[in-house]
């Protein structure tokens, strides 16, 4: 039976003054009354959403459906690509181009079976919304090879102030294979031009066999990505194993350590690494022990709360 799940925006804020070693952000216990308004129901496992300039809300459903919501009316969008709906995979994030009003581009990530091998992996496309369906669909990036494992697809999308597109792909359960190898996809944050081409100043352009779209590596499963409204820097958060969820500021060519360093342990209680720091590895600006499984982030700029 379909569950009626209200959609609401979860806002997360973390102070940038936290010290990664002390992890000592002071949180005030404060009773705050919020009012939740249901804008749509009948969506099972909504995963990503984006607003269009006219106030239309686009929402992805993990199973593969895409909806537009206008003035409380929910309509299913046609011609959505088939997704690899397994485990954590499916129809994932969606983002409107910063200049959507001029060019009409919408960007979508999803688990796709296209490409080499059985199973699926993270794919990025762009498309336009016309007459209730997706048109002009263009494939921008497909991580590979495919795998039948069901975990760690990423895959958040964000644009920076210069118009570059960032998206994430988790390490697909290949803990000791993908994250530290820049010749392989997964366990990475990617940076592209808005048409899917690779910026000439990406950190690994010209390196032999490197995936030139990679902007950072050593990431486990990044599911939060947001641009700081004042600095313009891209922040990300990612899932650790048992413990060790992290917040990081994205830096060009940086290694975020997975799985050479971690604050967490494996799900069977065994150690993954004895190190929480290592030369050449970026330390998180904040981490959680135990894990909270952060699944999305946004900066609060409103003065209403």
Task: Give the location of each predicted region.
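Sec-dependent signal peptide recognition
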Residues: 2-8
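Basic side chains
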Residues: 3, 62, 126, 156, ...
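Short amphipathic alpha-helical segments
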Residues: 6, 70-71, 179, 248
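C-terminal motif of bacterial Sec signal peptides marking the signal peptidase cleavage site
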Residues: 14-15
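Acidic, Gly/Ser/Thr-rich repeat motifs that build Ca2+-stabilized beta-propeller blades
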Residues: 19-175, 224-227, 232-240, 290-305
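Beta-propeller domain segments
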Residues: 21-29, 89-91, 99-101, 172-305
């Amino acid at each position: 039976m379909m569950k009626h799940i209200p959609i609401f925006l979860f806002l997360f804020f973390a102070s940038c003054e936290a010290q990664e070693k002390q992890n000592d952000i002071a949180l005030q216990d404060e009773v705050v009354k919020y009012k939740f308004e249901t804008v749509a129901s009948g969506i099972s496992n909504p995963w990503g959403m984006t607003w269009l300039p006219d106030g239309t809300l686009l929402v992805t459903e993990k199973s593969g459906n895409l909806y537009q919501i206008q003035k409380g009316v929910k309509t299913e969008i046609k011609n959505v690509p088939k997704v690899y709906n397994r485990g954590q995979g499916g129809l994932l994030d969606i983002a409107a181009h910063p200049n959507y009003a001029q060019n009409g581009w919408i960007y979508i990530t999803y688990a796709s079976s296209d490409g080499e091998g059985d199973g699926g992996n993270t794919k990025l496309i762009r498309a336009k919304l016309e007459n209730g369906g997706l048109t002009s669909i263009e494939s921008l990036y497909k991580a590979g090879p495919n795998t039948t494992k069901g975990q760690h697809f990423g895959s958040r999308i964000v644009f920076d102030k210069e118009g570059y597109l960032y998206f994430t792909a988790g390490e697909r359960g290949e803990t000791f294979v993908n994250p530290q190898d820049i010749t392989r996809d997964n366990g990475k944050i990617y940076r592209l031009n808005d048409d899917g081409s690779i910026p000439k100043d990406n950190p690994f352009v010209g390196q032999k066999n490197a995936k030139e779209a990679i902007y950072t590596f050593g990431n486990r499963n990044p599911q939060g990505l947001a641009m700081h409204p004042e600095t313009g820097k891209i922040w990300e958060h990612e899932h650790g194993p048992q413990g060790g969820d992290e917040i990081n500021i994205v830096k060009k060519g940086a290694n975020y350590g997975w799985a050479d360093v971690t604050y967490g342990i494996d799900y069977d209680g065994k150690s993954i690494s004895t190190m929480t720091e290592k030369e050449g590895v970026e330390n998180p600006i904040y981490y959680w022990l135990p894990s909270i499984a952060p699944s999305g982030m946004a900066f609060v700029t409103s003065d209403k709360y």
